[in-house]
C-alpha cells in the first residue's frame, strides 16, 4: 500500500528492491527496538542509594543530568515543532552514554493549571480525566520518537505522591525566615529565641499590647512570627479578573489590561493573598548568575527583572506627613518641581484629608473635571482600575490629579504641588517620585501637559525642546545650608547630596529593586491545595507532614464562580469553597481536637516546575522529596566555585525570567535549610529555537488548512480562492500544524529526527517544509545500503584494509562529529555524517565498503538515528545494544594534510594553483611555484623582482 502525506513526497513503498529501507521497514525496526529498550531498561540510570540503586555496582564518577523543560499535556497533542528540544537532548544524552557516563534523562508532565481546567469546563469532563488522557497521548507520541528516557523517573505534577512534596516544600518555606545578617533562610524555630532575647526586634510598625515579644499574648506572638515568614498573607493590590473568577499574576495580564487567557478585563484591587518573599533573595539571585553557564540574554533579562539600583531615599514634608521617594539621581533634587504618588499609595487619602479639599483658583488641567480633590481622586482611581502596570508605564498620554496639597523640597525649601498619576506604580520604589521634568522624559511629558515648571539642573541639553537625560555638570544646584554641587560631575554630585541628606536627617543611601514578592495563590480548582488551615482567630496553621498530601476533593462542580467581566467590585469565590465537608475540619495539631477551615485557594502552575528536577533524581522515595546522597551525586558541586545543578537544561527563552527565577528561589531556600548541596538548580541552560511554518488566511482573515493550499505563479490558492500567506508559529488554531505521527508513519521516526536536527543551529528558529523531509530519508537509505544489500538482504561490508584517504576521511569525521556533539551543533553532526556516507558510497558503491570504515559510522550516527543504527549494528554481527558502545577515537596524525593547495598570484592576480608538502619551507614553496607550467607561461620573458610566500596560504610574484 502506498502511503500519502500532504506534500506528496512519501517514499515509494509499493515497488523496488525487497530489502530497501522504506517507511514500513523503518516502522518495524523502530517498534522492535523501542520494545527492546523498554524490556531491557536500557536507559535506566542507577542512583547511589534507594529504590533505584543497583546493589554491588559502583557508579561511574562521570555522570550527566540532562533535562527538558517539561511539557504541558495539551488536548491538542504534539505538532512537529514540539519535539525539537526533546530530540536534541536525547541526541546529547545518547552521545554521552557512549562516552561512558551515567546519564539521567527522563520527562514528566506539568499538568496542573488553568488550561486543563478551562478545557474541562468546556467539555464537561473532570480535569483529572482529560489530563490523564492527554498525558497518555503525549507519551505515545513521544515514545514513537525513540527518546531514551528513564521511564521509572517520569512524574506528573497532578499525582498526589508528587504534590505531597510540593506541599512539603511550601511548608519548609512557610516555616522559614530570612536572616539579613547571614543572608540566608533559617527555620522559624531559630527565630523565636532571638525575638525573646530582643536580638531581633519586633517588625517596624507592629502594634501590640507590649513593646517586647515576651510580653505579647499568644495571638500577637503568632502575628509577629508571621511578619517574618518567607510565605505570608498580604492585603495588597492584585490583578482581579471577574470573567475568569481568579486573581492573575502580572505575567498573565496583557499590556492592554486583559487576561492572556480568554481576553477578559482585569482590574487592580486590594485582596488578601499568599505571597512568597522572593525579594529577600534579590542580591543572591543577581550575584549568582555569574556562576551559571547560561545565555547572556537570559542573564540580562533576569538582572533587569530584579532591577537592582543604587540611590537615595529622600523625605519630603507635606502637612505633617512624610512622603519618602527613592531616586537614583539625588543630584537632580534642585530640579524637582512637583511630586507624583501612585493612585494606590497609602498616603493619598490622608493627604487629601489634611488639605483644604478645594480646587478654588486651581488650573483646571489639575482637577480631572471635578470640584474637589476627594472627588477627583475617586474618579481618577475608577478610570485607571482596568489598566495593567505595563499599560500604565507605556502610556504616552500623561494623566493625573492634584491632591490639593504641597510638599517641601528638602534641598531648597520650595513648596511643590503633589499629584497622583498612573505612570507611578506602588510596586517599585516607594510608590512616589520627585519629578525632575528637565531630565526625565515621562516627567517632562507630565509637566508639559499640566503646565508645571521645568528647571535645568544638569548642563548639556536644550530643555525647551526635550528632557536632557544624559550626564553633565550640575548647574543651578546650591543652597545656603552648605550644599553646593555646581560644576560637579554626576557621581561626585550624587555622593555630596547623599552626605548632606544624611547629615540633615532628610534621607539616606539606599539600594532598591524592581522585583516584587511572588503572588502565590489562585482562585481555581485544578491546582495544589495549600497545606494550611485557619483557626477561629483567622491565624494560619501549617499542617504536619503526617497529614500530607492534602488531596484535592472530588467535587461535582469545579467551575470557578465567574462574574460579569466588567464587574470590578466582585470578590473572588474559589471553587474549593463549595466543598464544605472538605473545608470545615476537626484536627488535632498538637493541642487537642479543634475546628479549622482549610485554605480554599490553590497554588499557581509554577509550583511543581519550581522543584521537579529534584524529584527526577529520587522519584520513588516515600520518606523525602529527594535523598541528599542522590542529589549530591547528580547535582552536587564539583568544586568550590561550582554552583551545582542540572548539567544541561533545554527549553524556550519564554521561560527566561519567571519559571527560572522561581525555581532558583525555591532551590536557594532548600540549600539554606540544608536539604540540597547545590546552590542553583541548573548549571547550564540552552534555549532552543522554534520550528515555524507558513499559514494561510482567506479574504475574511480565517485560517485555511495549509496542506490543501496550492501555489501557482507565486500566488496561493485554497479551493480556487486566492489566500494570503503568513509566516510564524505552528499551531492547531493556525491550521498549519503537522503531527509527528504522520511523519513517523510516512517516513519513520529516524527520518524525522535527522530532518529536525539538520534544519539549522539548535538555538535558531527554522521553517518546516514537509517536502524536504524526503532528503533525510534518502540519506538513511544510503546509510542502509552501505551495510545491507537491497536485493537480498545480505551484508555487503568487506574486510578490506582502509586506504590512507579512507583513514583521513574517517578520522576527520570522528573528530568533527565528536566536537559538534559536545557543542550541541547537531546540524553539523548530520552534515558531516552525510559527507562521510557520500564519500564511502562514491568510493565503494559497487564493491562494498570496508567494515573498519562502516562500523564507526554506524556508531557515530546512533545518537541521531538510533533505531536504524541499532539494526545495522545487529546485522553487522553484534549482539548487544549500540547504546553503550564507546564513541570512536581519532588519531591526530590523520587530521593533518600531507599536501596543501596554494594559489599563486602574479602581480596581484591568481594565475595558478599548486600542491606543496604541508611542511614545505618558503624556499621549497617558491621553487614549486616557479616550476609550475601555468606560472612559467605567465612569467615567460619577464623578470621576477620580488617573491612573497605566506606558508600555507599563498605565493605572490611581482614581475616586470
UniProtKB/Swiss-Prot annotation:
It holds the Pfam family tRNA-synt_1g. A motif ('HIGH' region) lies at residues 71-82. Its main location: cytoplasm. Its EC number is 6.1.1.4. A motif ('KMSKS' region) lies at residues 729-733. It catalyses: tRNA(Leu) + L-leucine + ATP = L-leucyl-tRNA(Leu) + AMP + diphosphate. GO terms for cellular component: cytosol. CDD domains: Anticodon_Ia_Leu_BEm. GO terms for biological process: leucyl-tRNA aminoacylation. It is an enzyme of class 6 (ligase). It is found in: Cytoplasm. This is Leucine--tRNA ligase.
Amino acid at each position: 500500500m502506498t502511503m500519502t502525506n500532504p506534500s506528496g513526497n512519501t517514499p515509494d513503498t509499493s515497488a523496488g528492491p525487497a530489502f530497501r529501507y522504506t517507511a514500513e521497514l523503518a516502522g518495524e525496526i523502530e517498534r522492535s527496538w523501542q520494545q527492546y529498550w523498554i524490556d531491557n531498561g536500557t536507559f535506566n540510570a542507577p542512583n547511589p542509594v534507594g529504590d533505584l540503586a543497583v546493589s554491588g555496582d559502583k557508579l561511574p564518577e562521570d555522570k550527566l543530568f540532562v533535562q527538558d523543560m517539561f511539557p504541558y499535556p495539551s488536548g491538542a497533542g504534539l505538532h512537529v515543532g514540539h519535539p525539537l528540544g526533546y530530540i536534541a537532548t536525547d541526541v546529547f544524552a545518547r552521545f554521552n552514554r557512549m562516552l561512558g557516563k551515567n546519564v539521567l534523562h527522563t520527562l514528566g508532565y506539568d499538568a496542573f493549571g488553568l488550561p486543563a481546567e478551562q478545557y474541562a469546563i468546556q467539555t464537561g469532563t473532570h480535569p483529572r480525566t482529560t489530563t490523564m488522557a492527554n498525558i497518555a497521548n503525549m507519551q505515545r507520541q513521544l515514545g514513537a520518537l525513540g527518546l531514551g528516557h528513564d521511564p521509572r523517573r517520569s512524574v506528573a505534577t497532578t499525582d498526589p505522591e508528587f504534590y505531597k512534596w510540593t506541599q512539603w516544600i511550601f511548608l519548609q518555606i512557610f516555616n522559614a525566615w530570612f536572616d539579613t545578617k547571614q543572608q540566608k533562610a533559617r527555620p522559624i524555630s531559630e527565630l523565636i529565641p532571638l525575638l525573646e532575647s530582643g536580638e531581633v526586634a519586633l517588625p517596624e510598625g507592629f502594634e501590640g499590647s507590649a513593646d517586647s515579644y515576651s510580653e505579647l499574648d499568644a495571638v500577637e506572638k503568632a502575628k509577629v512570627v508571621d511578619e517574618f515568614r518567607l510565605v505570608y498573607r498580604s492585603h495588597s493590590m492584585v490583578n482581579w479578573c471577574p470573567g475568569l473568577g481568579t486573581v492573575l499574576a502580572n505575567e498573565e495580564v496583557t499590556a492592554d489590561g486583559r487576561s492572556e487567557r480568554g481576553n477578559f478585563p482585569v482590574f487592580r484591587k486590594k485582596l488578601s493573598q499568599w505571597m512568597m518573599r522572593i525579594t529577600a533573595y534579590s542580591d543572591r539571585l543577581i550575584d549568582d548568575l555569574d556562576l551559571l553557564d547560561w545565555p547572556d540574554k537570559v542573564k540580562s533579562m533576569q538582572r533587569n527583572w530584579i532591577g537592582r539600583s543604587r540611590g537615595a531615599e529622600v523625605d519630603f514634608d507635606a502637612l505633617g506627613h512624610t512622603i519618602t521617594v527613592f531616586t537614583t539621581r539625588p543630584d537632580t533634587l534642585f530640579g524637582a518641581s512637583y511630586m507624583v504618588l501612585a493612585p494606590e499609595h497609602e498616603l493619598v487619602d490622608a493627604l487629601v484629608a489634611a488639605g483644604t479639599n478645594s480646587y478654588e483658583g486651581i488650573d483646571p488641567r489639575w482637577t480631572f473635571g471635578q470640584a474637589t480633590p476627594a472627588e477627583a481622586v475617586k474618579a481618577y482611581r475608577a478610570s485607571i482600575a482596568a489598566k495593567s502596570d505595563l499599560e500604565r508605564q507605556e502610556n504616552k498620554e500623561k494623566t493625573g490629579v492634584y491632591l490639593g496639597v504641597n510638599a517641601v523640597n528638602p534641598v531648597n525649601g520650595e513648596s511643590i504641588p503633589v499629584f497622583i498619576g498612573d505612570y507611578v506604580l506602588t510596586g517599585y520604589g516607594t510608590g512616589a517620585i520627585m519629578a525632575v521634568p528637565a531630565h526625565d522624559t515621562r516627567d517632562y511629558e507630565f509637566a508639559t501637559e499640566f503646565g508645571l515648571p521645568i528647571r535645568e539642573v544638569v548642563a548639556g541639553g536644550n530643555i525647551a525642546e526635550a528632557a536632557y537625560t544624559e550626564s553633565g555638570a550640575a548647574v543651578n544646584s546650591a543652597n545656603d545650608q552648605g550644599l553646593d554641587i555646581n560644576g560637579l560631575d554626576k557621581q561626585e554630585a550624587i555622593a555630596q547630596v547623599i552626605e548632606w541628606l544624611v547629615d540633615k536627617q532628610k534621607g539616606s543611601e539606599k539600594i532598591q529593586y524592581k522585583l516584587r514578592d511572588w503572588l502565590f495563590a489562585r482562585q481555581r480548582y485544578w491546582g495544589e491545595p495549600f497545606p494550611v488551615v485557619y483557626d477561629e482567630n483567622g491565624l494560619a496553621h501549617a499542617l504536619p507532614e503526617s497529614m500530607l498530601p492534602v488531596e484535592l476533593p472530588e467535587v461535582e462542580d469545579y467551575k470557578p464562580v465567574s462574574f460579569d467581566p466588567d464587574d470590578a467590585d466582585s470578590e473572588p469565590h474559589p471553587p474549593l469553597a463549595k466543598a464544605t465537608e472538605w473545608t470545615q475540619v476537626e484536627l488535632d495539631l498538637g493541642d487537642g481536637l479543634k475546628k479549622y477551615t482549610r485554605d480554599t485557594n490553590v497554588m499557581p502552575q509554577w509550583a511543581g516546575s519550581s522543584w521537579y528536577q529534584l524529584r527526577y533524581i529520587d522519584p520513588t522515595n516515600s520518606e523525602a522529596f529527594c535523598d541528599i546522597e542522590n542529589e549530591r551525586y547528580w547535582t552536587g558541586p564539583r568544586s568550590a566555585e561550582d554552583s551545582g545543578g542540572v548539567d544541561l537544561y533545554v527549553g524556550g527563552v519564554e521561560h527566561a525570567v519567571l519559571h527560572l527565577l522561581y525555581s532558583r528561589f525555591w532551590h536557594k531556600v532548600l540549600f539554606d535549610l540544608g536539604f540540597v548541596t547545590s546552590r542553583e538548580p541548573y548549571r547550564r541552560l540552552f534555549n532552543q529555537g522554534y520550528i515555524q511554518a507558513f499559514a494561510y488566511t482567506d479574504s475574511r482573515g480565517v485560517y485555511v488548512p495549509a496542506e490543501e493550499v496550492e501555489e501557482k505563479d507565486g500566488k496561493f490558492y485554497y479551493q480556487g480562492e486566492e489566500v494570503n500567506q503568513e509566516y510564524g508559529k505552528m499551531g492547531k488554531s493556525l491550521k498549519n500544524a503537522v503531527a509527528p505521527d504522520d511523519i513517523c508513519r510516512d517516513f519513520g521516526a529516524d527520518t524525522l529526527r535527522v530532518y529536525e536536527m539538520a534544519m539549522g543551529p539548535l538555538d535558531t528558529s527554522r521553517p518546516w517544509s514537509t517536502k524536504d523531509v524526503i532528503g533525510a530519508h534518502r540519506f538513511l537509505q544510503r546509510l542502509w545500503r552501505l551495510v545491507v544489500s537491497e536485493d537480498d538482504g545480505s551484508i555487503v561490508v568487506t574486510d578490506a584494509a582502509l586506504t590512507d584517504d579512507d583513514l583521513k576521511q574517517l578520522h576527520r569525521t570522528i573528530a568533527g562529529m565528536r566536537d559538534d556533539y559536545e557543542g550541541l551543533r547537531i546540524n553539523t553532526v548530520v552534515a558531516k555524517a552525510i559527507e562521510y556516507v557520500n564519500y564511502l558510497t562514491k568510493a565503494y558503491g559497487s564493491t562494498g565498503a570496508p567494515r573498519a570504515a562502516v562500523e564507526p559510522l554506524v556508531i557515530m550516527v546512533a545518537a541521531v538515528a538510533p533505531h536504524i543504527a541499532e539494526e545495522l549494528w545487529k546485522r553487522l554481527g553484534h549482539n548487544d545494544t549500540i547504546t553503550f558502545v564507546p564513541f570512536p577515537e581519532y588519531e591526530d596524525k590523520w587530521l593533518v594534510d600531507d599536501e596543501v593547495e596554494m594559489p599563486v598570484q602574479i602581480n596581484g592576480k591568481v594565475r595558478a594553483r599548486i600542491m606543496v608538502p604541508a611542511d614545505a619551507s618558503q624556499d621549497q614553496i617558491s621553487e614549486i611555484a616557479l616550476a609550475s607550467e601555468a606560472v612559467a607561461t605567465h612569467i615567460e620573458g619577464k623578470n621576477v623582482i620580488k617573491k612573497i610566500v605566506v606558508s600555507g596560504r599563498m605565493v605572490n610574484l611581482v614581475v616586470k
